[in-house]
Amino acid sequence: MARIKVHELREKSKSDLQNQLKELKAELALLRVAKVTGGAPNKLSKIKVVRKSIAQVLTVSSQKQKSALREAYKNKKLLPLDLRPKKTRAIRRRLTKHQASLKTEREKKKEMYFPIRKYAIKV
């Protein structure tokens, strides 16, 4: 089997990807048997290509699944953890801009009764 082009995989449906994955895994099993029984050298070198193809199929299928989930949760209030942006732990726990801008009643009164003085310089 020749190397698979990823752009061709992206056009396939989910069921086609699953079928291709089964075929590739079956082929890999045959190649491993050939390796143990002392098969031809060209079969041994084919193992790497098949393993890479399996990885490509799995990657494309997981990317499709994740993009479908992103579409499903697009306008929802809460997102699953794996769809949220990956930030540092400290940034995730930081106050939101709204929370940081809130002021206590006492602070509001102090600002209202004692505003910052503005001075104009006479020329």
From Swiss-Prot:
Q: What is the lineage of its organism?
A: Eukaryota, Viridiplantae, Streptophyta, Embryophyta, Tracheophyta
Gene Ontology cellular component annotations, sorted alphabetically: cytosol; cytosolic large ribosomal subunit; nucleolus; plasmodesma
One Pfam match: Ribosomal_L29
Q: Which domain of life is it from?
A: Eukaryota
Query: What protein family is recorded?
Result: Belongs to the universal ribosomal protein uL29 family.
PANTHER family linked: 60S RIBOSOMAL PROTEIN L35, LARGE RIBOSOMAL SUBUNIT PROTEIN UL29-RELATED
As one GO molecular function, the record gives: structural constituent of ribosome
- InterPro entries in the record: Ribosomal_uL29, Ribosomal_uL29_CS, Ribosomal_uL29_euk, Ribosomal_uL29_sf
On whether Ribosomal protein is a keyword of this UniProt record, the answer is: yes
UniProt xrefs under Gene3D superfamilies: 1.10.287.310, 6.10.250.3450
CDD domains given in the database record: Ribosomal_L29_HIP
Kindly list the biological process annotations in GO that this record carries: maturation of LSU-rRNA from tricistronic rRNA transcript (SSU-rRNA, 5.8S rRNA, LSU-rRNA); translation
Question: Which keywords appear in this protein's UniProt record, sorted alphabetically?
Answer: Ribonucleoprotein, Ribosomal protein
The name this protein carries in UniProt is: Large ribosomal subunit protein uL29z
**Gene giving rise to this polypeptide:** RPL35A
